[in-house]
Amino acid sequence: MSRTLPHLLSSDPASPFPPAEHALREPDGLLAIGGDLHPQRLLNAYAHGIFPWFSDGQPLLWWSPNPRTVFRTDAIHLSSRFRRQLRTCTWTLRADTAFAQVIAACALSPRPGQDGTWITDQMQEAYLDLHRRGYAHSVEVFDGARLVGGIYGVAIGQMFFGESMFSGASGGSKIALAALAAELHGLGWPLIDAQVENPHLMRLGAQRLQREQFLQHVATQVALPEPPGSWTQRYGERHASALAGVRLT
C-alpha cells in the first residue's frame, strides 16, 4: 500500500529522514513535515536528496520529487545571440562576496504563478548560518559596484544543490548559472541540483533524472572531498565576457 501522509519529523535535528523513496506521489515528492532548519538537519537532508520548501504560514515541508530536475555542468544552454552579447559585456563575477544580498534579492524576485516567496526570513537566516559554516555559497554578477545577478545553494563534498537565482538586469541570472556551471565543470563536478522543473530552467538546459538515479549520484558525490580553500579565493574576480567562449553545450 502506498503512503498517503508525509512522515512527521521529531524535534531532534539529528533524527534521520525516512528514505526519499517513501515520498508521496501526490503532491509529488512530499516526504516529511515538521522539524526545524537546524544546520545538522539541513545538511542531512541535502546529503540524502531532500530539500525544504514551504511558504509563510505553512509548517516545514521536506521534498524529494520524482523525477528530479538537474543541470549537467557541461550543458547549460546559452544561445548564439546571448554569447555574442557576452563578448562585449563589462560585468564581473565573484563568489561568496555578497551572499546575504543574493539571497535577499532572490526572496524579492517575483516568480510566475507564485504569490509571495518561499524564501522566508526563517529560510534566509538558516542559509546565512550555513554560509557562515562554509556550506552555502553564491556566485555574483556585478555591473561596477551594483549587484545585477546571482545564484546561491549548498555544497557538500562535490555536489552543488542549487536553491535560487535572480536577475537585477537582463541576463543576470543566466550569467550567474553559466559561471557556476563552468567553475564546477572545471573542478569535475558533473551535476547541479535544480530541484523542481519549470519552463525557464528547461530553456536553460535543465534535464530530468529519475529519483533513484539522482540519489545514487548524490551518495557518490557528497562522499568526495571538496577542494581546499575558500570559494572567494578560488574564484577571484572574473570577466563575464569570458563565458562567451566557454563551451557548455
UniProtKB/Swiss-Prot annotation:
Report the leader peptide range: none
Q: Which residues cross the membrane?
A: none
Acyltransferase as UniProt keyword: yes
Write down the SUPFAM superfamilies for this protein, in alphabetical order: Acyl-CoA N-acyltransferases (Nat)
Keyword field contains Manganese = no
Q: Which processes are annotated in GO (biological process)?
A: protein catabolic process
UniProt keywords (A-Z) are: Acyltransferase, Cytoplasm, Transferase
User: Its Enzyme Commission number?
Assistant: 2.3.2.6
* Protein's cellular compartments: Cytoplasm
Query: What GO terms are given for molecular function?
Result: leucyl-tRNA--protein transferase activity
Its UniProt entry gives the catalysed reaction(s) as:
N-terminal L-lysyl-[protein] + L-leucyl-tRNA(Leu) = N-terminal L-leucyl-L-lysyl-[protein] + tRNA(Leu) + H(+); N-terminal L-arginyl-[protein] + L-leucyl-tRNA(Leu) = N-terminal L-leucyl-L-arginyl-[protein] + tRNA(Leu) + H(+); L-phenylalanyl-tRNA(Phe) + an N-terminal L-alpha-aminoacyl-[protein] = an N-terminal L-phenylalanyl-L-alpha-aminoacyl-[protein] + tRNA(Phe)
What is stated as this protein's family in its record?
Belongs to the L/F-transferase family.
* HAMAP family in alphabetical order: Leu_Phe_trans (MF_00688)
What protein name does the entry list?
A: Leucyl/phenylalanyl-tRNA--protein transferase
Tell me the gene name. aat
